[in-house]
Amino acid sequence: MEFKFDLHTHTIASGHAYSTVQEMAKAAADKGLELLGITEHAKGIPGTCDEIYFHNMRIIPRKMYGIDLMFGSEINIIDYDGSLSMDAELIEKTLDIRIAGIHTPCYEIGSVAQNTQAYVKAIENPMIDIISHPDDARIPIDYETIVDAAKENHTLL
């Protein structure tokens, strides 16, 4: 089985990327992808989009240049309990795909046990589809525990 998609990408709306949705869709089509996920950063990351952006995503076409598009967010895990930086209602009503990750502007790095718990709690959240960059060397974690939790909850890493 071959998967031809990229589900963790950012546009200029996230504040640190350099392409528009249309430019990214064209590039994805040129590379032979079948599905592209545009997942802008949630609040807490300097320069990212406001909440209204996520409400407006529903007007963007879900197909460009022959590839399917999904729109979502890379939501910040903000504490050791796996709390998220976006309201559940906004997540449920506006996002096709939901990624959660630890970003140091929004999270105080703790012990291996604390950081692992933060990830596991986010993985156990039924609103989360994917965990972003759990391999960040600045954030010590128990990889085996996280992989087991992801497998049990059908969450991508």
Where are these regions (language model features)?
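Metal-associated gating/positioning segment near the N- to mid-region
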Residues: 13-48
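Extended substrate/RNA-proximal surfaces in nucleic-acid metabolism proteins
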Residues: 2, 29, 42, 47-155
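Single, functionally critical "micro-switch" positions that shape active/binding sites
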Residues: 7, 39, 132
